[in-house]
Amino acid sequence: LSACTLGPLNLLYCGNYYFQYFPLRSFFPISLLFLISIHYATKSRKAKHIIAAVAWASIALALFCNFESGIICIIVFAGYVILQKAYLYTFGDPKIWKTIFAQIFCAIVSILIFICTVQLITYLRSGQALGINELFFGILAFEGTGFYMLPISFGLWIVYIIVLVYALYSALPKLKSERVGEKQIADTRISTALFVLAIYGFCAFSYFVGRSYSTNIYTLLFITLSLIHI
C-alpha cells in the first residue's frame, strides 16, 4: 500500500503541509490498490463483481476529489482487469474484447457521475451550470501554461523510468504463455503486481514530473523500491 502514498515525504523534507497533495491525492490510489489486492485474491465470481462495483464507485469519488488522481485510478483498474483476461484468452477471443468494452463503459459512467455531481452542486449553490471550459479550467490552465513547471534533470528520473520499463517488460511475457481453455498453470501473482505498480508509476511520473520541485522524485521512491523488492 505504501507504493501509492505519493506525497508524505513532502512533509519530511520541506515541511510543506499542502493537503491537496496528501492525503487528498493519495487516499483513492491507496484504496484502489487495496481493492485490487482483494479482487485478485477472491475466488468467488460474485464477490469479484461486487468488489469491481465498489472500485468503480470509488473512482467516481476520486474524480470528484481530484480529477487527475481519478484518471490514474481509471487507467490502473481498467488495465488490471484487462490483464487478468489477457492471461486467459488471446486478443482474438471475443471474451477479452467484451471485457475491454466493459471497462471503457465503466470509465465513461464514472466520468459522467463526476460531471453530473459537480454540475448539480454548482447549480444548487449558484443557480447556473458550468461550461466545459469552466469545468476543467484548472487542468487546462495548468497544462496549457506550464504553471510552475521546471525542466527535469536526468539521473534519478532515468533510473526511475528504467525500473518501470523493466517491471512492465517482466510482467507482459506471461501473456505469451500457453493457454488451456479457462486455465493457465503459471502463477500470475508476481506479474500482476509488477504490471499494476508499473502502470501506477508511469501515471504518477506523468503527474508529478517537473511540478514545482525537482525533489518530487522522492515522492515516487515508494513505487520504485516496491518494484525492486518484487
Regions from the PLM with identified roles:
Residues 228-230:
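Conserved small/polar residues in nucleotide/adenosyl-binding loops
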Residues 25-37, 55, 73, 111, ...:
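Alpha-helical transmembrane segments of multi-pass membrane proteins
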Residues 2-3, 37, 55, 62, ...:
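Small-side-chain structural scaffolding
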Residues 30, 39-61, 95-102, 184-198:
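Short hydrophobic alpha-helices at membrane interfaces in multi-pass membrane enzymes
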Residues 51-67, 73-78, 200-207:
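Membrane-interface alpha helices of multi-pass inner-membrane proteins
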Residues 1-25, 67-194, 207-218:
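Transmembrane catalytic cores of multi-pass membrane glycosyltransferases
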Residues 191-204, 220-226:
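Hydrophobic membrane-spanning alpha-helices of multi-pass integral membrane proteins
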